[in-house]
A protein has these predicted regions:
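Short, conserved loop/turn and helix-capping segments at secondary-structure boundaries
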Residues: 58-61, 172, 232
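Substrate-recognition/cap regions that form aromatic- and gly/pro-loop-enriched pockets
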Residues: 121-197, 219
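Midchain, well-structured core segments that form catalytic/ion-binding scaffolds
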Residues: 1-135
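A short small-residue
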Residues: 46-53, 156-161, 222-229
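Zn-dependent metallopeptidase/amidohydrolase metal-coordination segment
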Residues: 181, 188-255
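Generic non-transmembrane alpha-helical segments
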Residues: 24-34, 66-77, 146-155, 173, ...
């Protein structure tokens, strides 16, 4: 393996990845979501997946995992590379962490998620980044220990950074003030929910992310979705949001924290 690259962010499932390997095109088999190209006497193996956010990997297809599977199944690696790719394959085998022995779930947050965001070469070594959103039923130390055991001598786990889940009970006065205000203004009966994303609320000792989101919002042709290009919202929806924020802030001021 001369080159291996994939992904643009640690917290996103990549939709494309490629590896340049010393091999001949003749004899290599086709595979779903894989393309093969001759390149300077070698072969470029490209994987084509489906991208998504690390906090919600359901329905995604990790292109790095596709390339890893093809290299292993085709024998396009040395013995040392094979041991490493076998370790990486365990990561990509399940976004619930089953391949690494870290799968777990709890009531507030649901199941753990884990994805491989980027693959690159550094000083002759392949580096695979990981991003996991884990519930209250485990912690960073437990996850790291399990991963090290799962990969064995095929790979090393380095630069581990963990932040335990942050959770506030849904029936606390502050949360009730926010959700009741939202329902009162919109006429809906929504309930608060947890998510895997580490929002701006992480920067405060006692906070949650709060804001209106409408899945049935009609946008013009040039309007993009949340976090997408040309993100937009109707003016009426923005003005309604202002009303929600003002009322919620006034009610939060009356609560003794």
């Amino acid at each position: 393996i001369l080159e291996f690259e994939g992904g643009v962010a640690n917290n996103a499932v990549p939709d494309r990845a490629s590896a340049l390997v010393k091999a001949e095109m003749a004899g290599l088999k086709n595979a779903p979501h894989i393309t093969l190209e001759p390149e300077n006497g070698c072969v470029r193996v490209r994987g084509w997946g489906k991208s998504g956010h690390a906090a919600s990997p359901e329905g995604t297809v990790n292109a790095i995992g596709l390339v890893v599977d093809y290299l292993l199944d085709s024998g396009l690696c040395t013995e040392t590379e094979r041991r490493y790719l076998e370790a990486v394959r365990k990561l990509h085998s399940s976004t619930a962490g089953e391949g690494l022995g870290i799968a777990t779930s709890d009531g507030p947050f649901g199941p753990l998620t884990i994805i491989g965001g980027r693959m690159y070469m550094q000083e002759g070594r392949m580096v695979q980044t990981m991003d996991s959103r884990y519930p209250t039923s485990t912690n960073g130390d437990v996850i790291a220990a399990a991963i090290r055991q799962a990969v064995g001598e095929g790979a090393s786990l380095e630069d581990v950074d963990a932040a335990d889940p942050f959770y506030i009970e849904a029936d606390t006065p502050a949360i009730r003030a926010c959700i009741d205000t939202y329902n009162e203004v919109t006429g809906k009966q929504e309930k608060p929910f947890t998510m895997g994303g580490g929002t701006y609320a992480r920067h405060f000792p006692y906070a949650v992310s709060f804001g209106p989101e409408s899945h049935d919002m009609v946008l013009p042709s040039f309007g993009g979705p949340m976090h997408g290009a040309n993100e937009s919202a109707p003016v009426d929806a923005l003005l309604q949001s202002v009303k929600i924020y003002i009322l919620a802030l006034l009610r939060l001021e009356e609560i003794d924290f």
